[in-house]
Amino acid sequence: MFKSTLAAMAAVFALSALSPAAMAAKGDPHVLLTTSAGNIELELDKQKAPVSVQNFVDYVNSGFYNNTTFHRVIPGFMIQGGGFTEQMQQKKPNPPIKNEADNGLRNTRGTIAMARTADKDSATSQFFINVADNAFLDHGQRDFGYAVFGKVVKGMDVADKISQVPTHDVGPYQNVPSKPVVILSAKVLP
């Protein structure tokens, strides 16, 4: 009886030692992007960007991102993907989501954010990984901003490599990699 009481007290003490932030972060999903340039592992912040994270995870789980490309890459800025095939055919996304750019997360190097049009609530499937600090994309800097919803935890060297590939224009699209950089698969890690 003494052993079980002691074990229970130790468990309660251990749980109380964890901060709420640490407990929340423990449940944040990780997503692996397997690309033709290497792997990128993302940690998504479901506490600060629940709508964007759920949206991204839904696209991942449906297989939407498989065989899409990083269709816009700009050195010293970002790499954008999640919407086009290798033939630059746009995939049909789900309806747009609410912009969560006011969540306190910043567009710093290594973060992932939702791409959108000039309409603040127009983000669908496309996302970008910042390869530099891009404070001008943050909430309130020039407009509502671009919603950060996670960060690269492994493979930032791959994102940097992708940002340096040669590009050209394809019809109305600029900064398209000359040789497609393909997201072969995207999956939520256990």
Curated annotation (Swiss-Prot):
It comes from the Bacteria. It is an enzyme of class 5 (isomerase). Keywords: Isomerase, Periplasm, Rotamase, Signal. It is found in: Periplasm. The keyword Isomerase applies. Its EC number is 5.2.1.8. GO terms for molecular function: peptidyl-prolyl cis-trans isomerase activity. Belongs to the cyclophilin-type PPIase family. It catalyses: [protein]-peptidylproline (omega=180) = [protein]-peptidylproline (omega=0). GO terms for biological process: protein folding. One of its GO terms (cellular component) is periplasmic space. PPIases accelerate the folding of proteins. It catalyzes the cis-trans isomerization of proline imidic peptide bonds in oligopeptides. Residues 1-24 form the signal peptide. Its main location: periplasm. This is Peptidyl-prolyl cis-trans isomerase A. Inhibition by cyclosporin A with a Ki of 25 to 50 mu-mol, a concentration 1000-fold higher than that required for eukaryotic PPIases.
